């Protein structure tokens, strides 16, 4: 194929949604679809209309709103499925019907109870029916990775003859390795006489962690469409991750010569975060490209290298996917160069402090606290702050009443004085936040709030992380407890103490 554009077919709303504990609402699906359109996705598989009335309506609404991406709906090789897909899609500016049937011996015999000739006949009939509605028909050979190669070649040849313009080769259970999968695509191009009449697509699952590798190996052998999902969302171990294949193609142009996509890479990160928020599926911190640690550096050796030249330890610029903040973490593994750079960024001349002394105290704080923030470093310099035990605000007691009007009562120690306040809120967490704000007489804005389980069982501990914004600066707080409300209160108090120390630093600077 002369054109080396790789078509990006996103199935977050269909295959990705199957991984969720509950279905997404119509407006949630539309929000994701519009984000995918803005990202530059070529084909959006919006759902499986015959599966439920809700899915039908979601596909129909997406089809009516999205204008720049082709909207696709899935159907089995059955007339009612294909007809329903068309009814949902017909309002779209551009639409595709995607029909499929299993072709592996295992699936044909044990699941469908049919022989290969029957499956072949069903496939051709389905494609012809779909073609009566649109020229844009995709056919998938389900479990192609475990289908005998001669059967697969014959099926693909006949599917193209029947009118399919895109032939999808799925590794449905993530069984193949990149060299195997590449060989399947290579054989298809060598043995199927009419293969130039269709676009070959691949749909790889990640059961053995090979989804991205398999997809990339396939395009080297002639495939020109990759089916994928945002954040690799999907059944079992997930699907090929859109962000991974797109950035691999963009980053490794030396190896993947001439290949490109129309994805607006600068929108990748915000799309990833949006999908994570809507689906309530957190992104693992170590997830390639979009994980919180993907561009973070805590090792002193790595930090020193990045400070001298980012390419020493970063093969992708964070800004390429829309991240514009520095993720150099200050921990006990950080070196003097990192601390010096942080102080320079805060406006301190190296002649105004003793780096060895500051670094020694920094290490003591980092050993106790874990991650150290820039405001902690300032407090360490001006206030000799080296321990969380030196906090101005201490949480003493907490009680919460849930119901129609959630109410919290918080008692805090400020120096030697105990102060108690009771407040209401939209929920118990907000009520606690309001109490702490009133007691401290500080009014920061809550910018981020997250809960993560740190253990399992009925006595599981939850960690709450919060980001508060005060006078244009963000402050982080962390709390850990078997009670999520108590953990929230601890996190708020931790952040409030950081704010208080920053105010004391400003006083010292002015003195």
From Swiss-Prot:
Residues 6-269 form the Pyruvate carboxyltransferase domain. Pathway: Amino-acid biosynthesis; L-leucine biosynthesis; L-leucine from 3-methyl-2-oxobutanoate: step 1/4. Its cofactor is Mn(2+). It catalyses: 3-methyl-2-oxobutanoate + acetyl-CoA + H2O = (2S)-2-isopropylmalate + CoA + H(+). Its EC number is 2.3.3.13. It is an enzyme of class 2 (transferase). One of its GO terms (molecular function) is manganese ion binding. InterPro entries: 2-IPM_HCS-like, 2-isopropylmalate_synth_dimer, AIPM/Hcit_synth_CS, Aldolase_TIM, LeuA/HCS_post-cat, LeuA_allosteric_dom_sf, LeuA_bact_synth, PYR_CT. Keywords: Amino-acid biosynthesis, Branched-chain amino acid biosynthesis, Cytoplasm, Leucine biosynthesis, Manganese, Metal-binding, Transferase. One of its GO terms (biological process) is L-leucine biosynthetic process. It is found in: Cytoplasm. Gene3D superfamilies: 1.10.238.260, 3.30.160.270, Aldolase class I. Belongs to the alpha-IPM synthase/homocitrate synthase family. LeuA type 1 subfamily. Homodimer. This is 2-isopropylmalate synthase.
């Amino acid at each position: 194929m002369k054109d080396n554009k790789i078509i990006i077919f996103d199935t977050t709303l269909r295959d990705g949604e199957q991984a969720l504990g509950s279905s997404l609402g119509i407006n949630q699906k539309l929000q994701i679809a519009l984000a995918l359109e803005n990202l530059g996705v070529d084909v959006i598989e919006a759902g499986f209309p015959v599966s439920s009335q809700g899915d039908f309506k979601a596909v129909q609404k997406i089809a009516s709103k999205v204008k720049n991406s082709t909207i696709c709906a899935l159907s089995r090789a059955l007339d009612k499925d294909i007809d329903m897909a068309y009814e949902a899609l017909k309002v779209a500016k551009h639409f595709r019907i995607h029909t499929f049937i299993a072709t592996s011996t295992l699936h044909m015999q044990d699941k469908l109870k049919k022989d290969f000739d029957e499956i072949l006949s069903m496939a051709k009939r389905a494609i012809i029916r779909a073609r009566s509605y649109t020229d844009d028909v995709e056919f998938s050979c389900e479990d192609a990775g475990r289908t005998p190669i001669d059967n697969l070649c014959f099926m693909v040849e006949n599917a193209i003859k029947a009118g399919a313009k895109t032939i999808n080769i799925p590794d449905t259970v993530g069984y193949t390795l990149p060299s195997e999968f590449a060989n399947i695509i290579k054989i298809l191009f060598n043995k199927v006489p009419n293969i130039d009449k269709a676009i070959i697509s691949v749909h790889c699952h990640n059961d053995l962690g090979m989804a991205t590798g398999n997809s990339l190996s396939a395009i080297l052998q002639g495939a020109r469409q990759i089916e994928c999902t945002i954040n690799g969302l999907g059944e079992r171990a997930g699907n090929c991750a859109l962000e991974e294949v797109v950035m691999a193609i963009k980053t490794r142009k030396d190896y993947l010569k001439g290949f490109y996509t129309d994805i607006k890479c600068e929108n990748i990160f915000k799309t990833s975060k949006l999908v994570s928020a809507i689906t309530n599926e957190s992104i693992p911190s170590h997830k390639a490209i979009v994980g919180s640690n993907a561009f973070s550096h805590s090792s002193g050796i790595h930090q020193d290298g990045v400070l001298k030249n980012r390419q020493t330890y970063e093969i992708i610029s964070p800004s390429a996917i829309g991240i514009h903040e520095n993720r150099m973490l200050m921990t006990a593994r950080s070196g003097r160069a990192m601390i010096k750079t942080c102080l320079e960024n805060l406006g301190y001349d190296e002649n105004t402090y003793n780096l060895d002394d500051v670094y020694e105290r920094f290490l003591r704080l980092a050993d106790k606290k874990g991650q150290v923030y820039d405001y902690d470093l300032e407090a360490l310099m001006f206030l000799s702050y080296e321990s969380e035990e030196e906090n101005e605000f201490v949480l003493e007691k907490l009680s919460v009443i849930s119901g129609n009007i959630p109410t919290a009562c918080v008692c805090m120690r400020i120096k030697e004085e105990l102060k108690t306040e009771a407040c209401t809120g939209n929920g118990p967490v907000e009520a606690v936040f309001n109490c702490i704000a009133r007691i401290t007489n500080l009014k920061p804005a809550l910018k981020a709030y997250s809960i993560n389980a740190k253990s399992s069982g009925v006595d599981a501990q939850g960690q709450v992380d919060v980001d508060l914004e005060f006078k244009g600066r963000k402050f982080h707080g962390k709390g850990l407890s078997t009670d999520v409300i108590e953990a929230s209160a601890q996190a708020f108090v931790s952040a409030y103490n950081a704010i208080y120390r920053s105010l004391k630093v400003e006083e010292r600077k002015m003195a």
